[in-house]
Amino acid sequence: MAREVIGTCCVQSLQMNDIRHNNASIKHFVREHLGCACPDEVFENISATEQSDIFSSASTVYEIGGRLFVAVFVPADWLDMAGHLGKLVEAGKQFRDQHGYNRFRMVIATEDNDAENGLRRIFNDLPGIDDKTHLHVIKPGLLPW
Protein backbone atom coordinates (compact mmCIF):
# COMPACT_ATOMS: atom_id res chain seq x y z
CA MET A 1 0.00 0.00 0.00
CA ALA A 2 1.48 3.35 -1.04
CA ARG A 3 1.44 6.17 1.47
CA GLU A 4 0.71 9.70 0.40
CA VAL A 5 2.10 12.64 2.31
CA ILE A 6 0.13 15.85 1.94
CA GLY A 7 1.16 19.35 2.75
CA THR A 8 4.47 18.75 4.52
CA CYS A 9 6.01 21.74 2.80
CA CYS A 10 3.57 24.19 4.33
CA VAL A 11 3.77 23.19 7.98
CA GLN A 12 6.09 24.57 10.62
CA SER A 13 8.05 21.95 12.49
CA LEU A 14 7.35 22.00 16.22
CA GLN A 15 9.39 20.14 18.80
CA MET A 16 7.54 17.63 20.96
CA ASN A 17 7.56 18.67 24.60
CA ASP A 18 6.07 17.50 27.88
CA ILE A 19 3.02 19.77 27.79
CA ARG A 20 1.67 17.90 24.75
CA HIS A 21 1.45 14.86 26.96
CA ASN A 22 -0.23 16.67 29.86
CA ASN A 23 -3.71 15.15 29.99
CA ALA A 24 -5.19 18.04 31.98
CA SER A 25 -4.04 20.59 29.36
CA ILE A 26 -5.31 18.44 26.50
CA LYS A 27 -8.65 17.86 28.24
CA HIS A 28 -9.05 21.61 28.83
CA PHE A 29 -8.15 22.37 25.21
CA VAL A 30 -10.56 19.80 23.77
CA ARG A 31 -13.44 20.80 26.03
CA GLU A 32 -13.03 24.57 26.14
CA HIS A 33 -11.70 25.37 22.68
CA LEU A 34 -13.11 22.53 20.58
CA GLY A 35 -16.45 22.23 22.38
CA CYS A 36 -16.24 18.53 23.18
CA ALA A 37 -18.75 17.37 25.79
CA CYS A 38 -17.28 13.89 26.28
CA PRO A 39 -17.55 12.53 29.83
CA ASP A 40 -14.50 12.62 32.12
CA GLU A 41 -13.71 8.93 31.67
CA VAL A 42 -12.97 9.52 27.97
CA PHE A 43 -10.02 11.71 28.96
CA GLU A 44 -8.42 9.03 31.13
CA ASN A 45 -6.65 7.61 28.07
CA ILE A 46 -4.99 10.19 25.83
CA SER A 47 -2.13 9.51 23.47
CA ALA A 48 -0.30 12.20 21.54
CA THR A 49 1.60 10.77 18.62
CA GLU A 50 3.51 12.01 15.63
CA GLN A 51 2.04 10.39 12.54
CA SER A 52 4.20 8.98 9.76
CA ASP A 53 1.50 8.53 7.14
CA ILE A 54 -0.85 11.05 5.54
CA PHE A 55 -0.92 13.02 8.81
CA SER A 56 2.84 13.52 8.86
CA SER A 57 2.18 17.22 8.27
CA ALA A 58 0.19 17.41 11.52
CA SER A 59 1.99 18.94 14.48
CA THR A 60 0.27 16.49 16.81
CA VAL A 61 -2.41 13.85 16.61
CA TYR A 62 -4.41 13.02 19.73
CA GLU A 63 -6.31 9.78 20.18
CA ILE A 64 -8.61 10.31 23.14
CA GLY A 65 -10.41 7.58 25.03
CA GLY A 66 -11.11 5.47 21.96
CA ARG A 67 -13.77 8.01 20.96
CA LEU A 68 -12.08 11.11 19.65
CA PHE A 69 -9.45 11.61 16.94
CA VAL A 70 -7.92 15.12 16.81
CA ALA A 71 -5.33 16.21 14.23
CA VAL A 72 -3.64 19.57 14.95
CA PHE A 73 -1.97 21.48 12.13
CA VAL A 74 0.09 24.66 12.47
CA PRO A 75 0.69 25.69 8.85
CA ALA A 76 3.26 28.30 7.90
CA ASP A 77 0.63 29.57 5.44
CA TRP A 78 -2.98 28.39 5.68
CA LEU A 79 -3.49 29.15 1.97
CA ASP A 80 -1.01 26.42 1.05
CA MET A 81 -2.84 24.00 3.32
CA ALA A 82 -6.25 24.96 1.92
CA GLY A 83 -5.46 23.11 -1.31
CA HIS A 84 -4.98 19.88 0.65
CA LEU A 85 -7.95 20.27 2.99
CA GLY A 86 -10.22 17.85 1.13
CA LYS A 87 -7.67 15.02 1.14
CA LEU A 88 -6.79 15.60 4.79
CA VAL A 89 -10.44 15.64 5.88
CA GLU A 90 -11.20 12.49 3.89
CA ALA A 91 -8.17 10.74 5.39
CA GLY A 92 -9.28 11.81 8.87
CA LYS A 93 -12.78 10.47 8.30
CA GLN A 94 -11.38 7.16 7.05
CA PHE A 95 -9.05 6.87 10.05
CA ARG A 96 -11.95 7.70 12.38
CA ASP A 97 -14.17 5.04 10.83
CA GLN A 98 -11.48 2.36 10.54
CA HIS A 99 -10.49 2.74 14.20
CA GLY A 100 -13.99 3.13 15.62
CA TYR A 101 -13.74 6.73 16.81
CA ASN A 102 -16.94 8.73 17.27
CA ARG A 103 -15.51 12.05 16.08
CA PHE A 104 -12.74 13.51 13.94
CA ARG A 105 -11.74 17.06 14.83
CA MET A 106 -9.30 18.81 12.53
CA VAL A 107 -7.64 21.81 14.15
CA ILE A 108 -5.79 24.43 12.13
CA ALA A 109 -3.92 26.99 14.22
CA THR A 110 -3.02 30.26 12.53
CA GLU A 111 -2.71 33.95 13.38
CA ASP A 112 -4.31 34.98 10.08
CA ASN A 113 -7.78 36.39 10.70
CA ASP A 114 -8.88 35.51 7.14
CA ALA A 115 -8.25 31.79 7.65
CA GLU A 116 -11.51 31.02 9.48
CA ASN A 117 -13.77 32.17 6.64
CA GLY A 118 -11.57 30.79 3.87
CA LEU A 119 -11.08 27.35 5.38
CA ARG A 120 -14.69 27.12 6.59
CA ARG A 121 -15.96 27.85 3.07
CA ILE A 122 -13.77 25.10 1.59
CA PHE A 123 -14.70 22.66 4.36
CA ASN A 124 -18.45 23.30 4.00
CA ASP A 125 -18.23 22.61 0.25
CA LEU A 126 -16.50 19.25 0.68
CA PRO A 127 -18.61 16.20 -0.23
CA GLY A 128 -19.47 13.74 2.51
CA ILE A 129 -19.04 16.01 5.53
CA ASP A 130 -21.05 14.52 8.37
CA ASP A 131 -21.91 15.55 11.91
CA LYS A 132 -18.95 13.53 13.20
CA THR A 133 -16.39 15.60 11.29
CA HIS A 134 -15.42 19.03 12.60
CA LEU A 135 -13.08 21.83 11.53
CA HIS A 136 -11.69 24.22 14.14
CA VAL A 137 -9.63 27.25 13.13
CA ILE A 138 -7.99 28.75 16.20
CA LYS A 139 -5.15 31.03 17.25
CA PRO A 140 -1.91 29.16 18.07
CA GLY A 141 -1.94 30.58 21.59
CA LEU A 142 -4.94 28.36 22.40
CA LEU A 143 -3.02 25.14 21.73
CA PRO A 144 -2.27 23.04 24.81
CA TRP A 145 1.50 23.43 24.50
Annotate the PLM regions:
Residues G65-D77:
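Active-site ExK catalytic segment of metal-dependent nucleases
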Residues V70-A71, M106, L135-V137:
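Generic structural hydrophobic/aromatic packing signal, biased to beta-strands
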Residues V74-L126:
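Amphipathic protein-protein interaction modules
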Residues I64, H99, G128-D130:
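A generic structural signal for short, non-catalytic loop/turn and secondary-structure boundary residues
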